[in-house]
Amino acid sequence: MKLLGIFLVASFAFVLSFGEEMIEGENPLEDQRAELTSCFPVGHECDGDASNCNCCGDDVYCGCGWGRWNCKCKVADQSYAYGICKDKVNCPNRHLWPAKVCKKPCRRNCGG
């Protein structure tokens, strides 16, 4: 029983110390927003692990080759452009490119 009490006290102390670190530490989302004061044009190298907000344009994303190498800002084709646009609506640097309304692609009876 004594061992259980020691375990519970140690666990509680660990949880509290972890919570204080999260409160005192910086918010990674705020850091990302501070970094995004510019964006890359189509064809520029980009970081495949970073946000698509790094590439300028509502339908521009960071696309990579096999194994996350040779990453460049690319224009999404019509089938993916809507999803990319919806993802980029909340980009903190969206004011850097001419924003447009995200439009769903025409699936059938497109009047053509």
Curated annotation (Swiss-Prot):
Known tissue expression: Expressed by the venom gland.
Secreted recorded as keyword: yes
One GO CC term on file: extracellular region
Pfam families per record: Toxin_34
Residues with the Glycine amide modification: 111
Gene Ontology MF, one: toxin activity
Biological function: Reversible inhibitor of neuronal sodium channels (Nav1.2/ SCN2A) that binds in proximity to site 1 and displays increasing affinity as the membrane potential is depolarized. Induces excitatory symptoms and spastic paralysis in mice.
Domain notes: The presence of a 'disulfide through disulfide knot' structurally defines this protein as a knottin.
Membership in a protein family: Belongs to the neurotoxin 04 (omega-agtx) family. 02 (Tx1) subfamily.
Protein name (Swiss-Prot/TrEMBL): Mu-ctenitoxin-Pn1a
Organism classification: Eukaryota, Metazoa, Ecdysozoa, Arthropoda, Chelicerata
